[in-house]
Amino acid sequence: MPDMLAAACKSNQTNTEYDLVDLGGDDLSKVVSLVGTDGFMKLDKSKIPNSSRVKAESANAAEFCQPYRGTTVVLAYNSQNVTEVPTTAEELYQWIKDHPGRFAYNVPGTGGAGDSFVRTTVYNCIDDQEAMTSDDPKWMDQWDEGFAKLVELHPYMYKSGGSIVYPNKNQGALDLLSQGEIDMCPMWADMLLSQRAAGTVPAYIKMATIQPSFTGSVQSMLIPNFGSNPDGA
């Protein structure tokens, strides 16, 4: 979706089918990085019923989007195989080492759950908690320890055909967990709950939170200025 929206904006398309779009934090950040806020209409919140009751705020393009729900990344696990669930990041890292090949996270660029694992691991290695929510580039100088931790964990990740494999997209990791290929992975809470309710994920796949917690995201609605029915949106 971000690439399609950016392409429509850059090519000056009009009267498209993108009247109202629903974007998570990662997708919104990507669109803004590609085209800025030029492709969206600034919202008049007075025309949006109950918007004042929504406490969540988007870190990007706040004047152009209406948050409507937040979600978080949790630790999804196979309760048939995992009897002692990690409760802290350090316990999780040790679990990964103690159970080689039984943990996976998706390629960060393909889904927010994997991105959250990487981002949280990096910032867990920075003592100042402000770093997690700051966009100040000064924190980049302190990323090395976190990336070293990810390199340290790499040999213990899921393997296929004898090689380390990072699944594609959030769904790829959840499929591995559901199929018994792994016992644990980071996953969006709403994605896990909805698929478990639909019966596509076994009931014994459960979730837990750890401390410090994984990063989350806010879902927001935006109105592209190249849609066909902005008034209706």
Predicted features along the sequence, with ranges:
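A residue-level structural signature of the nucleotidyltransferase/glycosyltransferase Rossmann-like core
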Residues: D19, V74, D183-M184, S213
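Extracytoplasmic/periplasmic substrate-recognition and gating elements
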Residues: M187, M191, A198-A233
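Short, well-structured alpha-helical segments in soluble
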Residues: M4-N15
